[in-house]
């Protein structure tokens, strides 16, 4: 397994957009796979935020994670964010998600980010095991979420 920049693997856009739309499309009523793909394409950078990295095995796309400026419209003062960590269902429980998170942390460190944020509905224990710290529990998009922080 290797992790590359989405900027270098544009062919990963369609499967990633489909997966992420299926997983999180309900958060944006009226959204489409095409709109999600366009937003994801906007993260095709290597040396600035926003950026996305892609996990691959051979040419097969396994998952991705992003470093973005804002991920919660209600908490615009918090920036930047680890976002969109997703591993395809067939590839889970192999440590790929953890490697994607570590890579984003490394990218944030290169960009001199002092503190990184994330929010999660179900994965607080996963991120805590990677060293992330609880910041607060709140409601966002009609769901209870936990905001966490970590220093790159």
Model-derived regions, located:
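Conserved GNAT acetyl-CoA-binding A-motif
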Residues: 108-120
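Active-site rim helix/loop that mediates acceptor-substrate recognition in acyltransferases
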Residues: 25-54, 62
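Conserved beta-strand in the GNAT
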Residues: 52-54, 60-70, 81, 86
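A short beta-loop-alpha structural element at the N-terminal edge
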Residues: 2-16
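Conserved acetyl-CoA pyrophosphate-binding loop and the N-cap/start of the following alpha-helix
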Residues: 91, 95-103
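C-terminal "cap" of GNAT-fold acetyltransferases
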Residues: 118-123, 133-152
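Helix-adjacent hinge/juxtasegments
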Residues: 68-79, 94
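Hydrophobic alpha-helical core bundles mediating ligand binding, dimerization, or RNAP-core interactions
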Residues: 16-24
């Amino acid at each position: 397994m290797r992790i590359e920049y989405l900027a270098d693997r544009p062919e990963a856009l369609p499967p990633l957009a489909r997966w992420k739309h299926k997983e999180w499309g309900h958060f944006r009523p009226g959204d489409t796979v095409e709109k999600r793909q366009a937003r994801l394409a906007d993260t095709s950078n290597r040396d600035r935020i926003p950026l996305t990295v892609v996990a691959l095995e051979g040419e097969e796309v396994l998952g991705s994670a992003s470093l973005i400026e804002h991920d919660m419209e209600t908490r615009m003062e918090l920036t930047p964010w680890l976002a969109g960590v997703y591993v395809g269902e067939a590839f889970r429980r192999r440590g790929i998600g953890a490697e994607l998170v570590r890579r984003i942390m490394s990218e944030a460190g290169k960009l001199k980010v002092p503190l990184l944020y994330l929010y999660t509905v179900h994965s607080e224990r996963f991120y805590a095991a990677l060293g992330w710290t609880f910041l607060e529990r709140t409601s966002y998009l009609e769901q209870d979420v936990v905001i966490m922080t970590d220093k790159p």
